[in-house]
Amino acid sequence: DMMGVIERYDPSIDWVLHLGDVCAWGGSYSFWRDLYKEDYFHRFMWAGVNGNHDNMSRKYQLTNAYFRDANYVPRNGYEGELGVCYHFRYGNAMFVMLNNEDMRDDAGFEAAAQWVRKVVTEARQSSNPPQYVFVCEHYQWFMGHTGKKSQYNRWSPIFDELGVDVALAGNNHIYVRSGVLCDGKETDGTRGTLYVQTPSADNERGMT
């Protein structure tokens, strides 16, 4: 009961951020129906990214239709990703939510990258720019058990360019947190991006 532990530690939870694999078999409607019967999904606002399990049915058919239709998120993503990729403001922070499943080839990644550039630049240039920018996706920045670079290689030049403050990911089931990095090197923290990936709720694969 991870949420129960968090509530006992600090009951002032504003909302919940989920980094993908919300459901075991998200391509099957019954899993979303059962999810929203859970107490915490009634009581807390939450935002999440589409993970690979959120696409898979029990027959291994792939669809994110239920992720899109069962969750009420801003429809401000790019073509083909409305209701799956999205961005929002909370206080002085901007959150940009990505879908790795649509970035498996170069064309898919480039579409996502151009959208991130567009929405972050527009926000930075607005009359009320965010103080912090978070970018969230499911797949890990680094392979936690080896430290080998994963999605970091794809995204770090763009994050450096845009001044993204924090990059959040999941999937690897191992807690990883970098120093603040820019151009592949740790900085004094005044510039660069902090990369964090979260474990599963039971931390089944350890920490690094």
Language model region names:
Residues D1-Y29:
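N-terminal active-site segment of His-dependent metallophosphoesterases
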Residues V16-H18, G48-V49, V135, L168:
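Residue-level marker for buried hydrophobic side chains located in beta-strands
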Residues C23-Y29, R104-A107, F142-K149:
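Acidic-and-aromatic substrate-binding clefts and catalytic sites of carbohydrate-active enzymes
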Residues G20-D21, G51-N52, H138, G170-N171:
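Active-site glycine-centered loops adjacent to acidic/histidine catalytic or metal-binding residues
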